[in-house]
Amino acid sequence: MHIIITRPKEDSLDLINKLINLGHSVTHIPVIKIEKLEIKKVNLENYKAIIFTSSNAIKYMNVEKFNSKIKCFCVGSATERTAKNAGFTNTFSSEGTVDSLIELIIRTHDNKSGKLLYLSSEFISKDLDTDLINAGFSVDRISNYTSFPVEKIDEKTLNFIKKNPPDVFFI
């Protein structure tokens, strides 16, 4: 089976390798590019927990004082694994959606215990911070990365796809 993966390569390497090991042909065609935004250093001591909806937020963290024991709420297991690899030890993972992450935070974290830090993309699909603020939490959202479309696919890849049409797309 020929499978096309459209996520950025660093976010797809595990999946690409698994699919290849299962005997599939995999073509990687990223449709977005991720880039760090310059932000001032964040002092984690000002927060009781951090919220991550993407591994990119962890990858592009710019912290003044790192606290490995700070509570980390992660959108899914891949993001939680990235947080652990970055040195965080107090991690919690939801079921892979922003709604399940909001529910996890509301259910397990005292909204009076202090401020939450939400590191995110410049562009988000859901206002997690607004939902938590409406639930009584104090949240600072800082965008530390952005995304933009990839505008050109190289000719070699296009020719390969024309000769080998894909069976499946992973977006």
Task: Report each predicted region and the residues it spans.
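Signature of uroporphyrinogen-III synthase
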Residues: 1-171
